[in-house]
Each structure stands twice: as C-alpha cells, then as structure tokens.
C-alpha cells in the first residue's frame, strides 16, 4: 500500500532521487517535421503536454511560448515554436478531441499558446482538477511527483533561454521530463482512485502560539539573554541622559556667549 500526504513537505524533495525522461527526444524545427510528429501523436492513446517560455526579467514584458513539448511513454517531441510558429499541424494536434492531452495548470498554457494564434482547445485533462479525488491538496508538478512516486523533478533549467539557437541536453531532458511526468501522474492517480491502494496522511498545519504577557512570565524564567538585554537597555537610558546633560551645558554656554556679545 502506498502512503501519500495531503500536503508534501517541500524540504524533503532535495533528498529524493532525481527522475529523468528515459526515452527518445526529437527536436522539431520545420513544418514538415511537425506534420510527421503530429501524425505520430494522433495515432497514440495518450499524450503528456507542457510548454516553456523564455524568462523575462523586465517588468511588464513577456515573451511568447518558445517550446511545446508533447510526449508519449517512449518518445517526446519538442516543437520549437519560436522557429516554426503555429503551423496547421500543431493547431490540429491541440484541437484534437480523440487523444487525451494530459497537463498541469493547462489554463495558463492555453492562454500563452493563444498569444501565438487562436485555436479551439481539444481534449485537455488538467491534473490539478483530479488530484483532489485522492485527498492531495498540492498542485505543483514537483510536489505531486515527489508525493506519489518518491522522486524529484529538478527545476534548475526552468529559467534558462528557451529561444537559444540550440537547446542543450539538460534543457531537452528537462522539457521532456515535465511532459512525460504528466502521463505518469495521471495514470497513477486514476489507479489509486480505482483500487484504493493508498493511505492518506493528513499533515497538521503549523500554528504559531502567542502567549499572553502574564502567561509568558509564569511559564518562562528570565534567561541570561533577557537579563543582558535589560542591562543593555539601562545602559542606553544612562547614555541618553548623559547626552541630554551635555546638550544643556552647550545651550547654557551659547547663552553666555550671546550675553557677552551684547
């Protein structure tokens, strides 16, 4: 039986083994290549889909989607939209109503894709809309994967240049992993829901208790740190008084000087 949590501790993620897409990655940089890739995907039974956009560090400026990654269990195609735009074959893929396209936070991706061209979204399934069925409240891909599979999806490549002339191997593997992971999550969530083969652990919310002044005085003895703080405060008060006397003396001397001048 699998143990899952309603909320996964993000501090535990770094200690988990990293997962990477194990299959073949194909970069699509022409319309003819896109046509072939779309024909392949529409012959499959499921697709994992995600997008990447070049980060903008200028307020109010946002780049268009640069990459559309579409994965099966074995092969992931990376459509370089910054080179080929949105050809008819890609629109046909995104508008299809026969092969389910699994993603996460699809509303954001579709809005971004619409900035390139208008299309009618097809059979999209958002993991965020179904994960609550098994009691999980987290919505990020990294937390969901860590929770359900006990593996880490690294996000180090997320803010790299997705409009580079050539994507490096780390970028390609990262992009493929995100799309492929959506298939794994979707199928495992459905399996757990159908078989009930899991134990849900509800994590208690961390609360900060604020004690009343009297309670704090009764429950705590004065620590050396408190004593030194009080002493420091007294020293500050004495120093302030000394400064005040010095100022008064200076004013008195100034008045004497004015009187003599007259």
Predicted regions and their residues:
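Conserved DEDDh/DEDDy metal-dependent 3′-5′ exonuclease domain
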Residues: 22, 26-29, 33, 42-46, ...
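N-terminal accessory regions of nucleic-acid-interacting proteins
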Residues: 1-47, 116, 127, 180, ...
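Short helix-capping/linker segments at secondary-structure and domain boundaries
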Residues: 187-197
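Asp/Glu-rich intrinsically disordered low-complexity tracts
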Residues: 215, 219-221, 225-226, 231, ...
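Generic alpha-helix initiation/capping and coil-helix boundary signal
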Residues: 168, 175, 224-225, 247
